[in-house]
């Protein structure tokens, strides 16, 4: 028997709820079904989102719990089919790896290029759901191995859409000519971090952006991505590295002073090995990518050739 008791709205500061009551006989049970719609103003105008949420919740109610459960189970079964890891002889490890696989797949689906991966996933509140360079270093490889290529591609497109803000971030620190510094912490491409030794010095994050492009193309063979999106990012980051290094007469080579490595054990050090290596590698990879796009996508190359040639000249010197 379905019962629909009257519901009273309970509302106070930062709190809203329904309160309802019903009578049952001894031995009877009541099952409560709650249908909730979670929509974002990223997708709906503010004055329309309430009505859209109501329609969505009512549509879910019309389907009913059993059908919704079946649809959810089928979706997860399809997901697990391509990403499960089976470990024999170690129950704890098996449980742990499947827990993490579940969290990764629940956190990101690749359906919306405006979204990214929060450091604590979908269920953790710490860090407020912002985006770190950890996405490229640790998140992207998981999706490359377990999901369709477009899922990882969307993570790269997310960074491409933030390129203009990365250039503005670099300009605030005195860099010019289209040099790009991707933020340590962000939601929309603007820097959201407030500790100077991290924000200004942990610049290895730029290398994570460029290596992610290489990693994606190496796994998928989608070299068209370079022409469409990737090359512009490589050029912007390469311009940053070109301006960030300085010549040392004593060392007879370029140095990079005042940086913090990814382990954050030491701040404000000179010539962090990881950072220097990624900077050098990025410049070489950018030059190779420019040559590839010039040969394979001449029209696209013509659109960005001025930027590209400036990078080639810098590398040749």
Give the predicted meaning of each segment.
Residues 89, 123-133, 193-206, 263-276:
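Solvent-exposed loop and edge beta-strand segments that line ligand/cofactor-binding
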Residues 96, 148-162, 225-241, 293-317:
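Extended, well-ordered alpha-helical scaffold segments
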Residues 81-86, 103-106, 137-149, 197, ...:
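Well-ordered alpha-helical scaffold segments within catalytic/enzyme domains
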